[in-house]
């Protein structure tokens, strides 16, 4: 199986997530970035015969015609606790209250921005993982994928 996995922890830093939210408000930058993402999708789909994307608007803006879309959600306080624990492991100097405030602010900004506001993609399967850990969430998503696209069962 040939694949590329990209999991750069810097992409999830507070600095990057705040910048991403700010950049998403600018329609010219937003249009340019979405076009780059869509071009990458076409190239990678041809090379690997499929692609899995992750992001706040992948299913609604970047790849709205995807075969299968998920909308992962969790309670704000649960998300803040998870992010705070991640930062503690990385020895970041930040409080839970700061993380909670940052997430709350980003949610409001992303849901209320003029261009491409954050929303549940049309046709997406909603998975609320407030009560599930990472492994449980992966298993839930995999089971849904296999039930909707059985031919993938032996490929993932």
Model-assigned labels for residue ranges:
Residues 24, 28-90:
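ATP-dependent NMP and nucleoside kinases share a basic, alpha-helical "lid"
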């Amino acid at each position: 199986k040939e694949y590329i996995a990209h999991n750069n922890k810097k992409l999830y830093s507070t600095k990057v997530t705040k910048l991403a939210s700010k950049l998403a408000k600018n329609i010219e930058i937003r249009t340019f970035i979405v076009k780059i993402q869509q071009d990458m999708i076409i190239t990678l789909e041809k090379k690997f015969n499929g692609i899995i994307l992750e992001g706040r608007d992948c299913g609604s803006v970047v790849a709205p015609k995807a075969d299968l879309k998920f909308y992962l959600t969790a309670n704000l306080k649960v998300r803040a606790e998870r992010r705070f624990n991640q930062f503690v492991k990385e020895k970041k100097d930040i409080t839970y209250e700061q993380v909670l405030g940052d997430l709350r602010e980003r949610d409001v900004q992303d849901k209320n921005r003029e261009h491409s506001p954050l929303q549940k993609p049309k046709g997406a399967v909603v998975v609320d993982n407030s009560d599930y850990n990472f492994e449980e969430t992966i298993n839930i998503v995999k089971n849904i994928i296999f039930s909707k696209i059985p031919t993938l069962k032996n490929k993932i």
